[in-house]
Swiss-Prot record:
The gene is psiM. The pharmaceutical interesting psilocybin as a treatment option against depression and anxiety is being investigated in advanced clinical trials. This is Psilocybin synthase. One of its GO terms (biological process) is rRNA base methylation. GO terms for molecular function: 4-hydroxytryptamine 4-phosphate methyltransferase activity.
Length: 309
């Protein structure tokens, strides 16, 4: 986990339940006095996420039973990496630390987890979040209001068949946005969701059920095709955003996206690797500006990734 992630050493479930009593029925004290939560129970997932967001970020979040429930620790990893990227970029460009930062979250979901975390941590950040699912849009907007973020976080509806980087298409000037974030649909269609276990083992654990819909979790061609479209759209929007970023769940997808960046002669890109237990996930960032990130932000130490640079 990221060095600034407060969950690096795990979570004390009992202490968390004391701070968020609704979680108490799902916390078990084991014979060795350790505590555990059965994340195979969807309600336990939702309450655990709500508890962390409430205790550690002061956020009150509604999480529908039939939509994806995000895990806070690995979502925070991504936010912290983006923060690091922006810090290096601001220093290189001579921009003030207290400047207004504006970002985009693609496919924000019902929780709007990324912009919620970002806006709660950084008071000078504002975000536009896109979503195609109407129930997710409605719930995310309620979450924005519940946390008094209307002035800093806008949820906009987009289309499955339309462009992905809609806010950039509507931008009025160069570098109007500092970054994009995205947790793309992982699966290649509903059948892939039924047969693949590749997305398990990260977040709530291998036995935890997925509560998301096909619209949230699947797209034709899977995550690689989705992010590839982002890359192609960025070619015409390059000066409107400093850094384009996205999560990736599969190593194969990472290789495909790096290959596409190279094909378009985009040499300014960075990779991040998240490790949780035996499972690895990745993030990719690319840019058309002259600022190059240091190796500790852009080149994971994993030797299996060395051919990507």
């Amino acid at each position: 986990m990221h060095i600034r992630n407060p969950y690096r050493d795990g979570v004390d479930y009992q202490a968390l339940a004391e701070a968020f009593p609704a979680l108490k029925p799902h916390v078990t004290v084991n014979s060795d006095n350790t505590t555990s939560i059965d994340f195979a129970v969807p309600e336990a997932q939702r309450l655990y996420t709500a508890a962390l967001l409430h205790r550690d970020f002061g956020l009150t979040i509604t999480l529908p039973e039939d939509r994806l429930c995000p895990t806070v620790p690995n979502r925070l990893n991504y936010v912290l990496w983006v923060e690091d990227i922006l810090k290096v970029t601001s220093d290189a460009l001579g921009l003030p630390d207290n400047r207004q930062v504006k970002g985009i979250d693609i496919g924000t979901g019902a929780s709007a987890i990324y912009p919620m975390l970002a806006c709660s941590r950084f008071k000078t950040w504002s975000m536009v979040a896109t979503e195609v699912d109407q129930k997710c849009i409605d719930t995310a907007r309620l979450n924005v209001i519940a946390n008094n973020l209307q002035e800093r976080l806008a949820i906009i509806a987009t289309s499955v068949d339309g462009p992905i980087l809609v806010p950039l298409l509507q931008a009025n000037s160069d570098f109007e946005y500092d970054f994009t974030m995205c947790n793309p649909p992982f699966y290649d269609g509903a059948s892939d969701m039924q047969t693949s276990d590749a997305a398990k083992g990260f977040g709530f654990g291998v036995n935890a059920p997925h509560t998301g819909t096909v619209l949230e979790m699947a797209t034709e061609g899977g995550e690689s095709a989705f992010v590839a479209q982002m890359v192609r759209e960025s070619l015409n929007l390059q000066t409107r955003c400093r850094w384009f970023t996205s999560n990736l769940g599969k190593l194969k997808s990472l290789y495909e996206i790096v290959g596409l960046l190279r094909e378009h002669q985009i040499s300014n890109y960075a990779i991040n690797e998240y490790v949780q237990g035996a499972t690895r996930r990745y993030a990719i960032a690319w840019s058309f500006i002259d600022v190059r990130l240091p190796d500790h932000l852009s080149r994971p130490s994993n030797p299996d990734l060395s051919s990507l640079f």
